[in-house]
């Protein structure tokens, strides 16, 4: 099992989305979002190659893969499998212009 490093931008994404779900759907949904993100990341530590290879041209996503957050199927966790760890790059809604968000 590889250690996981959550980049600051990814942590902010996660907390911002949890806050949004808290406000729009209630605290239970916000908490479930955090739990499902954490469960997805934990699975990546065991199966780092399980995500889909991303095809964006943005350099921040070079070498990245993505998985969907279970129960929140439009939310993507972008990560980079490295020999020594899994690096979580961003957690973003799939309907957004991903490359624009990264600029």
What are these regions (language model features)?
Residues 12, 28, 39, 62, ...:
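Short alpha-helical
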Residues 30, 52-56, 100:
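Short, hydrophobic secondary-structure boundary micro-motifs
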């Amino acid at each position: 099992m590889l250690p996981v490093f959550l980049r600051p931008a990814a942590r902010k994404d996660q907390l911002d989305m949890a806050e949004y779900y808290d406000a729009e759907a209630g605290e239970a949904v916000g908490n479930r979002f955090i739990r499902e993100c954490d469960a997805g990341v934990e699975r990546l530590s065991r199966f780092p190659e399980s995500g889909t290879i991303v095809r964006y041209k943005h350099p921040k996503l070079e070498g990245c893969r993505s998985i969907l957050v279970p129960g929140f199927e439009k939310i993507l966790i972008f990560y980079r499998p490295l020999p020594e760890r899994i690096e979580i790059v961003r957690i973003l809604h799939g309907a957004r212009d991903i490359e624009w968000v990264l600029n």
